Amino acid sequence: MSFVTAAPEMLATAAQNVANIGTSLSAANATAAASTTSVLAAGADEVSQAIARLFSDYATHYQSLNAQAAAFHHSFVQTLNAAGGAYSSAEAANASAQALEQNLLAVINAPAQALFGRPLIGNGANGTAASPNGGDGGILYGNGGNGFSQTTAGVAGGAGGSAGLIGNGGNGGAGGAGAAGGAGGAGGWLLGNGGAGGPGGPTDVPAGTGGAGGAGGDAPLIGWGGNGGPGGFAAFGNGGAGGNGGASGSLFGVGGAGGVGGSSEDVGGTGGAGGAGRGLFLGLGGDGGAGGTSNNNGGDGGAGGTAGGRLFSLGGDGGNGGAGTAIGSNAGDGGAGGDSSALIGYAQGGSGGLGGFGESTGGDGGLGGAGAVLIGTGVGGFGGLGGGSNGTGGAGGAGGTGATLIGLGAGGGGGIGGFAVNVGNGVGGLGGQGGQGAALIGLGAGGAGGAGGATVVGLGGNGGDGGDGGGLFSIGVGGDGGNAGNGAMPANGGNGGNAGVIANGSFAPSFVGFGGNGGNGVNGGTGGSGGILFGANGANGPS
């Protein structure tokens, strides 16, 4: 019943009020009893006598019922008084127990506070104007204190305090005008999440830059990395960069997300990078933060966090590029996906972020991250889609490389080029190239090239080339080339990938393999070459 509250003093007051009501009613009933229970007959006739007896009997019954009501009223008052007393006793007992607990903690914490400057058990104090950094949590248990959020221009926010053995790191404080946010505190050595970075301070100074977001705190063993703080807004200059996400615990956890770049009049801030996913068996990188929007040039997205689990790893996705909103503006590029690695099992690189929309030029899609594994499946991340535009669409990002020593290496697909909507002068973005798939023993498959960006009336984007795939003792499969983007003016299809891999700057063909098909276009892409001993070349794309 933790949701029930009681105020003993209010119960005592209510009991007294109810008792006073009962006293008043008893006095009134006693006054009325004499005149109502003995009613004189109006005359000597039988009818008058009967009426008098009726009223007298009614009054007598009323007095009997009133006596029962008075007894119930008295019992109710006693119950209220008893309940108030019980609650008062319970509060006194609880207060005594709490005092005992506080006294016990004080005895336990005093030596540790004197020796190490922090308690054994308890949360760290929040930062203040005089001491902006949050205090560290208890050595055994407790969260770090939050950093102080500054109100003075140019002064950075306070850092969050670190946790002890178990607990979460404190959040960083917000920076003053134009100043950086405070870093998040580290999580507990055994268990706990890192604190979030503080927001960067905004600025309205001409040509000024918003404050950078604070970095998220790391999680040492088990826990999530803290998210990076957002960059500060700039009314007349450049937005602040987003803070980087904190790393996950080395045993288990997820890297923190990068902070969003600050928006601005001139150039949007770059998004923060995602935190590393460094779990022993499972590694999950944090996503990069989005770039800030701007009237002129949007900010680039932050890179996804790397991942390094021993059995399973996923790199974080890159952040999306910020939009450019005014006429003649350019958008930010998407951030690259995080690389991923594993010993035995599965590793996949993060996808590249989407390019932002720009009035003049769309942002390019981010590169897909690499996925590499010793034995198992390594998959490259997908390239990000190019950003749309009223002028020229952004290029799709290239797919990441997928590699393995023994198993399957699959390259990521290239991103689709950005669309262009300006009637008559629009140019679709180029499709991204497919990633290379490499395997020493097994199967290497290149990623498909991205399709070119479409346009309403103008030049469509060329399709991206397919990635090469293969290896020394593996079957190689080249990725298909991307199709040309739709448009009134001609565009070319991408070439198919070859059966083989590029190593040390030179192409090494596979003994067995199949080339990828060329993409469709006014000039169809050329099919990729097959294996030198067995296989087939890819078909040329139709024109």
Curated annotation (Swiss-Prot):
Organism (species): Mycobacterium tuberculosis (strain CDC 1551 / Oshkosh)
Gene name of this polypeptide: PE_PGRS44
Protein name, entry field: Uncharacterized PE-PGRS family protein PE_PGRS44
Domain PE: 1-93
Classification via InterPro entries: PE-PGRS_N (IPR000084), PGRS_rpt (IPR048996)
Family the entry assigns: Belongs to the mycobacterial PE family. PGRS subfamily.
UniProt-annotated stretches for the region Disordered: 194-214
Gene3D superfamilies documented for this protein: HP0062-like domain (1.10.287.850)
